[in-house]
UniProtKB/Swiss-Prot annotation:
GO terms for molecular function: potassium channel regulator activity; voltage-gated potassium channel activity. The chain crosses the membrane at residues 49-69. Belongs to the potassium channel KCNE family. InterPro entries: K_chnl_KCNE, K_chnl_volt-dep_bsu_KCNE2. Residues 70-123 are cytoplasmic. It comes from Mus musculus (Mouse). This is Potassium voltage-gated channel subfamily E member 2. Glycans are attached at N6, N29. PANTHER family: POTASSIUM VOLTAGE-GATED CHANNEL SUBFAMILY E MEMBER 1, 3 (PTHR15282), POTASSIUM VOLTAGE-GATED CHANNEL SUBFAMILY E MEMBER 2 (PTHR15282:SF8). The lineage of its organism: Eukaryota, Metazoa, Chordata, Craniata, Vertebrata. Disruption phenotype: Mutant mice show increased pentylenetetrazole-induced seizure susceptibility and mortality associated with a reduction of myo-inositol concentration in cerebrospinal fluid. Interacts with KCNB1. Associates with KCNH2/ERG1. May associate with KCNQ2 and KCNQ3. Associates with HCN1 and probably HCN2. Heteromultimer with KCNC2. Interacts with KCNC2. Interacts with KCNQ1. Forms a heterooligomer complex with KCNQ1 that targets to the membrane raft and leading to currents with an apparently instantaneous activation, a rapid deactivation process and a linear current-voltage relationship and decreases the amplitude of the outward current. Disulfide bonds: none annotated. It comes from the Eukaryota.
Amino acid sequence: MATLANLTQTLEDAFKKIFITYMDSWRRNTTAEEQALQARVDAENFYYVILYLMVMIGMFSFIVVAILVSTVKSKRREHSQHPYHQYIVEDWQEKYKSQILHLEDSKATIHENMGATGFTVSP
């Protein structure tokens, strides 16, 4: 039984050594040029990802800042001394002031269409 256990152990070690040696040689079966090329490709892909992210974030930031600046600029223009805006502001203010000052003078007016026929006015 000792020889069988020893044989099993020996076969296991032999197969393990052959398999590991084969897999290591298969994995490392590349030339130095191929390894250098693979390292360069890996590095370039990573740098292009960073460059891509920087460009995308920059474009997004530019658009956001442009929208913000245009909004602030248009709001500032609304409150400027431009004649169009002054006309609207003064016109509405005068209209409301005159209505408030003459509230007691307001009267109800009824207009009657004398040309309408077929309708009678109830007393």
